[in-house]
Amino acid sequence: MTILTFQNVKHILAASLLSLGLVACDKGTQFTEKTDDNTQTKSSIEQIKKNGVVRIGVFSDKPPFGYLDAQGKNQGFDVEIAKHVAKDLLGDENKVEFVLTEAANRVEYLKANKVDIIFANFTVTPERKEVVDFAKPYLKVALGVVSPKSHPITDVAQLKDKTLLVNKGTTADSFFTKTHPEIKLQKYEQNTETFDALKDGRGAALAHDNLLVLAWAKENPNYTVGITNLGEQDLIAPAVKKGDKELLDWLNQDLEKLAKEGVIHQAYEKTLKPVYGDTINPKDLLVE
């Protein structure tokens, strides 16, 4: 697999977003159906099997976790695990329909039945647990802040009265909105937009998951992650629609199986280790 960089992922995204991003609009998994004017609950897993495909929401512009490669194919750590989930559910890893999502759309896509499962670097928070059901976590993460080496940000206090770039609906957005109102936030939908804004000088720094900014800074040597571990360590997990206990229970069992089989570690070796090398101990990153 070719590791795609931030520099060219945005060009592939533009060409693929229309055809892939709206793919779920007419294939909603039905939880209820009308029969003789009586509403009967229908198994979500049964409906997925009837459809012959599981719809999984992933990122298109967040390498090495979820992105489109030069051929427009979905790649990344989240994608690797999602393929195994599809194989265990439907017997074939190709029976998955990847639906491109942005951070701010993840909850809405589940609510609107545009996806069955979200595998898009979804950080577990109390607020999100109120509106979706999270499965077992598979990654640990904190926040990081990246800035130009010429004007490095090494302490949050340096950001007072400055502009900080974040993505809408992310943990970074929530953290700085709640705890640092003195910092002006400039928000963007797509990761590529946010990093382009940093390069263009539209903000003093950019805050995102530390794993993402560390990977980006390795590709962009004029920038440094001056704050590598901000806030509490959080967990990243897949999610299903609120109340879909059947699919949630199945997913939890499958993730436990995949961890025991070493699949999650294999996904790390294939997608993350080529990026981070020895700078990150997998034990500090993976939940196995």
What are these regions (language model features)?
Residues 83, 95-158:
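Acidic, polar ligand-binding/catalytic clefts
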Residues 60, 139-147, 210, 214-255, ...:
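Periplasmic-binding protein-like
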Residues 26-34, 80, 84, 88, ...:
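Extended ligand-binding regions for polar small-molecule ligands
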Residues 41, 96-108, 151, 186-196, ...:
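Short helix-initiation/N-cap motifs at beta->coil->alpha
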Residues 105, 122-130, 175-178, 192, ...:
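A ligand-binding cleft/hinge motif common to bilobed small-molecule-binding domains
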Residues 21-24:
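C-terminal motif of bacterial Sec signal peptides marking the signal peptidase cleavage site
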Residues 28-35, 39, 49, 174-188, ...:
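Ligand-binding clefts/hinges and TM-proximal coupling segments of bilobed small-molecule sensing domains
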Residues 33-118:
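Extracytoplasmic small-molecule ligand-binding "clamshell" domains
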